Amino acid sequence: MKQSMVFSPTLREVPADAEIKSHQLLLRAGFMRQNASGIYSFLPFGLKVLHKVERIVREEMERAGAVELLMPAMQASELWQESGRWYSYGSELMRMKDRNAREFALGATHEEVITDLVRDEIKSYKKLPLTLYQIQTKFRDEQRPRFGLLRGREFLMKDAYSFHATQESLDEVYSGLYKAYSNIFARCGLNFRAVIADSGAMGGKDTHEFMVLSDVGEDTIAYSDTSDYAANIEMAPVVATYTKSDEAEKALEKVATPDQKAIEEVSAFLNIAAEKCIKSMVFKVDAKLVVVLVRGDHEVNDVKVKNVYGASVVELASHEEIKELLNCEVGSLGPIGVTGDIEIIADHAVASIVNGCSGANEEGFHYVNVNPERDFKVSQYTDLRFIQEGDQSPDGNGTILFARGIEVGHVFKLGTRYSEAMNATFLDENGKTKPLIMGCYGIGVSRTVAAIAEQFNDENGLVWPKSVAPFHVHVIPVNMKSDAQREMGENIYNSLQEQGYEVLLDDRAERAGVKFADADLFGLPVRVTVGKKADEGIVEVKVRATGESEEVKVEELQTYIANILK
């Protein structure tokens, strides 16, 4: 491709609203442009990268036995109501009405559509297992789109769905697609980890996320320093044991704590260690209000709260709800005096507190010398906190460290969550009607492009791995007015294309500095510069990833490049 014919508008300055490297560089290099908040156009070079990631995804999915189809982006609300997710999915689901006031959703995911499709066609175990996938634009009404392609409102996704007669069949396909995902991200050149995860609004169990390691990742990975254990921090169980002090219990006392609301403030004001404080939070679990307690130096894990109750939706209660429930502000919450019809659950660590501190459910006051069970009752002690660095690894090997990650893939064993709700059944080998057993498997294709850009860049621009680079080789005649340079550049361009390489020829009448700056921004694996030694049959070859350069005779160029790109 000749650069003079390509739409690739570059930017010299960093866009003000671009916070992270991938967002900045994809804009500066002219790979994409923003249309609205969280909505982007892929320009020609960006689209080539996107297509290359798609190709890798298709190759590995089909190698794993999946078959491609394409489903509609618009989905009838009746299907979502049938599955029970129309109301539980939340405000991120983009909803709309047609001119007849019929409700639809713009697809954020396709479990309902694929289950409806398969239940009408697959009636016998003889047609199972079946794995179908699509690569399609998805929509999500993000409250705060940010980080470019990493958190957008419109994005390209590969979603796959498998259907089975037995759990063993699901396990086998899940394992195969887990391997396929590992192959996909490895072929993209990414440094990633597969971690134990939460199924969230998808439902089901046994799920893993594929995380690209990056400091800008919005997820925290908890991993062992000595074993292969890794999990999303939401899902890492705490296996710590707590020993109760033999300190004698003291009389409960209410003390004034004016303007002291946060644990750190109360702890300092009362000269009590944070681990002796009881942090109280009120959650709305589906429609039920629950008081959740953790130690002052710990944080409540809302996913664990959700799992305790098997709830669809868990969110913090509003100030108004707390005021109505306990007649106090958030900074004064505590378990003492909570009426019996309001359930209190607590993390294991709370049970070991002796003569602790808690809010008094009265503005500007706290209790000291608080002792669980004596001063308040807990209906259940369980694991409710986030794991922390330094905690024992859940597998018993080593201690926990943290890393940040960008989620690019997620695989789920859905089981019969959707098939039972939507009456998707088959006849087994004994003629008995059973619900289809399902799995689902997603990859953020456009997000993967951003993750690659986030891992592969330097101070001058992008540094694409050869597997996804828009072109393999960038040929740059320095002076297009020089017949020798221009003709040699075109000859190299043509001969490399004949050898099967994708080549970009910078045939623009621009200054050398502009050409080299753009070349660094684009980040193609190999740059061939045709300069003043063209008359001698010599060019300069530079490897973008390492910065190494060498003068090479034109007749040796193809072999030299082949060794670089092998």
Curated annotation (Swiss-Prot):
Give one Pfam hit by family name: HGTP_anticodon
Q: Which UniProt keywords apply?
A: Aminoacyl-tRNA synthetase, ATP-binding, Cytoplasm, Ligase, Nucleotide-binding, Protein biosynthesis
Reactions the enzyme catalyzes: tRNA(Pro) + L-proline + ATP = L-prolyl-tRNA(Pro) + AMP + diphosphate
This entry's Gene Ontology molecular function terms read: aminoacyl-tRNA deacylase activity; ATP binding; catalytic activity, acting on a protein; proline-tRNA ligase activity; transferase activity
Q: What is its main location?
A: cytoplasm
Localization terms from the record: Cytoplasm
**What's in the GO CC field?**
cytosol
EC main group: ligase
Highest taxon of source: Bacteria
- EC number(s) given by UniProt: 6.1.1.15
Q: How does it assemble?
A: Homodimer.
What family is reported? Belongs to the class-II aminoacyl-tRNA synthetase family. ProS type 1 subfamily.
Concerning NCBIfam families, the annotation shows: PRK09194.1, proS_fam_II
Q: What is known of its domains?
A: Consists of three domains: the N-terminal catalytic domain, the editing domain and the C-terminal anticodon-binding domain.
Q: What does this protein do?
A: Catalyzes the attachment of proline to tRNA(Pro) in a two-step reaction: proline is first activated by ATP to form Pro-AMP and then transferred to the acceptor end of tRNA(Pro). As ProRS can inadvertently accommodate and process non-cognate amino acids such as alanine and cysteine, to avoid such errors it has two additional distinct editing activities against alanine. One activity is designated as 'pretransfer' editing and involves the tRNA(Pro)-independent hydrolysis of activated Ala-AMP.
Report what the protein is called: Proline--tRNA ligase
Gene designation: proS
